[in-house]
Amino acid sequence: MTGGPLRWTPVPSRRIVFAVPDLTSTILPQLTSHRIPGLELGADAIHPHYAGLSLLNLAASIERWLGLPPGPHAPLQLPALDSLAQGAEQIVVCLLDALSLSRYLQWLDGPGRPLQGMVDAGLLAPLTSVVPSTTTSALTTLWTGRSPAEHGILGYELLLREYGLVANMITLGPAAFDNQRGLLERAGVRPQSLLPVPTLGTRLAQAGIEAHAYIGNSIRTSGLSRMHYADTTLHGFGSPADLWHSLRQLAERPPDGRRFAWAYYSGVDALSHVYGPDSDLVRAEFEFFVRAMNDLFVQPLERSAGRDVLLLLLSDHGQVATSPQPHRQLSLHPDLTRRLHLSPTGEARLSYLHLRPGEAEAARAYIDHEWPAEFTWLDSDEALRAGLFGPGTPCRQAASRLGDAILISHGAAYLWWADKPDTLLGRHGSLTAEEMIVPLLAVRLE
């Protein structure tokens, strides 16, 4: 992938391959043409489709399938998926971090071949992520049923003004110090208290529905995990084989009523950051994961009598290929940083600027001069009001966490402000199709 502007090229519909709905060709035009009124986000921007074709709406659908009272947001506008899910005894949702729709389709006939039996009997639909297109925001939406504006987890690094700290929202430690993970909790802050809305596990427990979450051992007790998985039975795993073996053991055990199981796997995302999302290593990791899913979960369950499972495979965002460029290091731009109260927050590809009074015009002019046409500048209050971060009433912390202005990256652009080497070959957070459009694959195993 080149460093120029990324263009979305729809992959031809695989009508011969899919025996039941492949909704890609009908839904993609809706996603690429959708616009949030009053917001100009750039020519390559995919606007989040919060009205019925986004991860926010998937959260509402899952709650409805499990019999929970309706939440504040619309479910997915996918009647075929509702029919597939109707009456399912168990719902298993697996999120494979950083898998864009385009890469999924490219890999389906190669490393994704183990999925073939699943797609022959299932449903494929493209959805948009939320804004920003990042794990902390998307997972929190899926586990609360609320938009990023409502739940307030608006990026990877956020200014938590109430604690006087820029925090890493995965580790809940200072963003500037990797060796202080969990500092907020050690200081007495309960991770769940950072969410102003209830989580799915708590709502399921109140309804008497069994809930499980399978998280890699290295992040099972992270701040973000502790924020999300209250009232949920938490399981660790060491590899994809371990994950799918454990999930099959759970699914083969008859539930007392309905059951919800969630799995999160970060291997594709981690390797994409280091080696680039188009590297052979990432393709191999994807193949390793889906082969384990097919061999240790899908095929054995299809041979098991009396099991009724709805399996969803989805992603939170994709990635774009980037190359480290010294000109993007803010330490080399004192004429910009002196106009900021503190370093940017949010994402390297969707940055929140905390401006000194009266410096907005000069900061914007500097950015336009140094990186022409690479960023779109948005007033943070305007973006929040217009619904870029989702519908609903924003939580009281949202405005301060977004700062004064937002920089939306185009093409492969980004900013780098961390006090460590810039080595990443894959990034996300912005609004390109590669970051925003993700696959949802569903199959009923019975």
Placement of each model-derived feature along the sequence:
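His/Asp/Glu-rich, glycine-adjacent segments
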Residues: V17-P75, L108-L124, T128-R259, Y264-V274
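A short acidic-Thr-Gly-centered motif at the start of a beta-strand
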Residues: P75-A88, Q249-R253, V298-G306
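Short hydrophobic beta-strand that contains or immediately precedes a catalytic carboxylate
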Residues: V93-L96
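A short, conserved beta-to-alpha structural element at the edge of catalytic cores
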Residues: G117-L139, T337-P357, K420
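A long, amphipathic alpha-helix that forms part
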Residues: V268-V309
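A beta-strand-loop signature enriched in Asp, Gly, Thr, and Trp
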Residues: S304-L355
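Active-site neighborhoods of enzymes that stabilize oxyanions during catalysis
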Residues: L340-E446
